[in-house]
UniProtKB/Swiss-Prot annotation:
Upper lineage: Bacteria, Pseudomonadati, Myxococcota, Myxococcia, Myxococcales
Domain of life: Bacteria
GO terms of molecular function: acyl-[acyl-carrier-protein]-UDP-N-acetylglucosamine O-acyltransferase activity
Chief location category: cytoplasm
EC number: 2.3.1.129
Pathway: Glycolipid biosynthesis; lipid IV(A) biosynthesis; lipid IV(A) from (3R)-3-hydroxytetradecanoyl-[acyl-carrier-protein] and UDP-N-acetyl-alpha-D-glucosamine: step 1/6
Subcellular location: Cytoplasm
Official protein name in the record: Acyl-[acyl-carrier-protein]--UDP-N-acetylglucosamine O-acyltransferase
């Protein structure tokens, strides 16, 4: 275990022998640091935070501090982080709230660029790319492989679907369907994330089916329920389309159009 002599690792913290803790970093008493995780100088790991394997926390990141919620009264809420994530300089990640289930969750293989923020009770899937100064409000849910460009933001309780792309400076206030791109100060649909789907290894056949579903839902004159019914009738047996439809059906805030 490589712990710099100026680091503060409080009694009760569980640090794997293969982890590294840098100069003037602080690890709180309820923190668990997994194998091969590297905590940089001046970083802070607080709260009931669990980090998996191979994560890297850069200087001045604050991971696991209490939620920015006036209802919070010191309850023992958590932050659970998977493996191989990168938290760059100045990133802030809050623990959950009792009202939101008590846990903020981050998957594996994500990149959080400098000064980005993940609010309380967020659920982030695998492979997310969260660019500089992105702000995710409380209770936001990101499915796998979502990309947020710089200075974008998401309102509380919004859901962002798998392989969606949020352009820079975009304000998301409603759910963003899987495979879609949104842009603009008030997010509007800007087409499908074809490049992202190709990079994720989707075949041209699979991408073509998603395009068909997209056109029925967003380029016809049908209402949402009627469009969903048509998609299910014509394409619903295909996995990607079925996921697209389930997401649309599950919306509480409405769908970005």
């Amino acid at each position: 275990m490589a712990i710099h002599p100026t680091a503060v690792v409080e009694p009760g913290a569980q640090v794997d022998p293969s982890a590294e803790i840098g100069a003037l970093a602080v690890v709180g008493p309820h923190v668990r640091v997994g194998p091969r995780t590297v905590v940089g100088p001046h970083a802070v790991l607080a709260g009931r935070t669990t980090l998996g394997e191979g994560n890297r926390i850069f200087p001045h990141a604050v991971v696991g501090e209490v939620p920015q919620d006036l209802k919070y009264r010191g309850e023992p809420t958590e932050l659970v982080v998977g493996d191989r994530n990168t938290f760059r300089e100045g990133v802030t990640i809050s623990t959950g709230t009792v009202q939101g289930g008590g846990v903020t969750r981050i998957g594996s293989g994500c990149l959080f660029m400098a000064n980005s923020h993940v609010g309380h009770d967020c659920v982030i899937g695998d492979g997310a790319i969260i660019a500089n100064s992105v702000a995710l409000a409380g209770h936001v849910e990101l499915e796998d492989h979502v990309h947020f460009s710089g200075l974008a933001a998401a309102h509380q309780f919004c859901r962002i679907g798998r392989l969606a792309f949020v352009s820079g400076l975009t304000g998301v206030t409603m759910d963003v369907p899987p495979f879609c791109t949104v842009a603009g100060p008030r997010a509007e649909l800007a087409g499908l994330n074809a490049v992202g789907m190709q990079r994720a290894g989707l075949s041209e056949e699979r991408i073509g089916r998603v395009k068909q579903a997209y056109k029925i839902v967003f380029r016809s004159n049908l209402g949402l329920a009627e469009a969903i019914a048509q998609v299910e009738a014509e394409l619903g047996m295909h996995e990607d389309v079925a996921h697209f439809v389930r997401f649309l059906k599950g919306t509480q805030r409405g769908i970005t159009r």
